[in-house]
Amino acid sequence: MENITHEVNENVDIVVIESSISNKNLGENCLVQELYRLKESSKEAVEGLGEFTLFKKYMHIERESQRQLEKLIFKASKSNIAQLILVCGSVGDGKSHIISYFKNMYPEIMKKFILHNDATESLEPSKTSMDTLNEVLNNFSDENIENSNEKFILAINLGTLNNFIDSKYGERFSKLRKFALEKKILESNIEDNSFDEKSSFQFVNFSDYHLFTLEDGRANSSYIKSIITKITDSSEENIFYSSYKKNCYECDNCNVCPIKANYELLRNEKVQESIVDLFVQCIIKNKIIISTRALINFMYELIVPRSYIDVNSTRLKKDIRKLHNLDYARCLMPNIIFNHKELSFIFEALNSLDPLNVRNQKVDDFIIKFNNSTDILPYFKEYVDFPSGYIEKFKNIDFGKTEDTRIRYELLKLFIRGYYVCGKGNIFSLKDRIFESYIQNLYFWNRGDKSKLKNLYDNTKNGILKWNGESEKDQINIFIGKNQIKYRVSEDIQLKVDTSNLPRNNDVELKKFGTVMILKYKSEKLNRSYEIEVDFSLYKLLLQVIDGYRPNKKDKNHFIKFIEFINKLSETGSQNEKLLFTEKNRDVNKKYKLEYDNEFEFYRFVEI
């Protein structure tokens, strides 16, 4: 008999409802009804380990984590010893969806296993979640595991696993604790999780797998694109496309409906690639974790502009017909993507990537040209790959006569954002070149390709040496005593790169990888190395420092660990033997050195 617990907000992957949105006014003829299946707050958005519906089967997409878990389950089912498979991860990452999928696909094999969904609530009100885990895992305790032949799959969040092995029950499960620590399950390290036939413990950590992969120095996501394709694909199985084809063409609002327009735009391959790129940027730059549940809900928010349209209104279609030009422009997908941080944490991250914040000479020149033009729609036709009729609603506006500057401004925003997601031609660049170089370095670092990493290590070293201000080659400025107004104080330091910690991975496409790079340096004076974790924010800041930027107080508060790292390296420099002083703000800045003569035991201060 299966031992299953459920948690309302925990084990969710594919978000569905089995009945259409309740709106009698719509009848059975609106795309919104089917799109509502994607909404996170829908009636049946919660998924445990139970029924795997036809719609879930349609939306299911195979992932690498699924393939790894499948291998473990197949081998564990044939083992002669007890087997506990830890399916670890975070909220909404699809643990229960995949287990539910296996139950449906391999019922005979899954019958051999007891299944348990970790939950913050216990089986009984009087018991805590720790009490429950202690009870259900009894056969895997130190005293029972050798005599057990039980097969058990535990879907558990990393935080709960950590709390359990550190709880009062940890002593009973010291072997499980040892396994978790040796495999570094609770750390950010990427460890091998292949089946160990001599062990009763196996694991797959969903947190090791990202929504994207790295290949040839670029990020890709067949997973995100597959989810979009499930929504937009022109196949008979696709209920969304079937509804669009059946209802949208004949709808009275077909030429003025932003929902139809956004659905059509989402079918554009350029748009899909841009969405993938934006998601990768959100994950790397903002360090957010995007679950499949949140991803699918995002697709709903992307198509349905609920900030301007109430889909539950009995006047929905009339309201759409009455949308004025300003709100219609705001309802279009490029504006939705970047302009609604209130919708979710994903939209909040996207708001920080708004291409309206990109300023360069070509962008500024275009804005002037756009604002002075009496006919702006040709710009869209020439440079933005919108579907036919996407901005048809604006064709009758006489921009030479209208005094309403707001509509021109909204269309300017629509153009720049639209050019970002599906532009054509080469009118200006909105690319983040620093991010592109970070992804390239991240790929080569995770592969351990030393020949491609010299610039990364050199740039980081230069950033370290210039963090406290411009200095001579192989010198670093230090702060001693009072704040020096007249002199800059420096020391000699010889930093050497240490690549002993580089990962080793010969795969061309990386499916398991770290999203930060751990770089090591050592001084020639000491054999000991110090390491620093370089994420995108630090990577970008160091490049700015190399170009002359001086970190401010906010930067120093944000990168405390990096400052501690610099201080450790500084202690290995020449400060105990020689200091260099350079005058500031003079026509000719003189240089001096203070050094200690070991032979005669005295200090000497001389001009260089």
Q: Model segments located where?
A:
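C-terminal structured domain segments
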Residues: 397, 412-426, 445, 487-590
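Extended alpha-helical coiled-coil/bundle linker/stalk regions that scaffold oligomerization
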Residues: 224-490
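Conserved small helical "lid"/interfacial subdomain of P-loop NTPases
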Residues: 183-246
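Walker A/P-loop nucleotide-binding motif
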Residues: 78-98
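Switch/connector loops and helix/strand junctions flanking conserved nucleotide-binding motifs
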Residues: 95, 124, 160-166, 212-215
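AAA+/P-loop NTPase substrate/partner-engagement loops
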Residues: 105-139
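A short, basic N-terminal segment
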Residues: 1-82, 433-439, 443-444, 448, ...
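Loop/turn-to-beta-strand initiation segments
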Residues: 147-154, 200-202
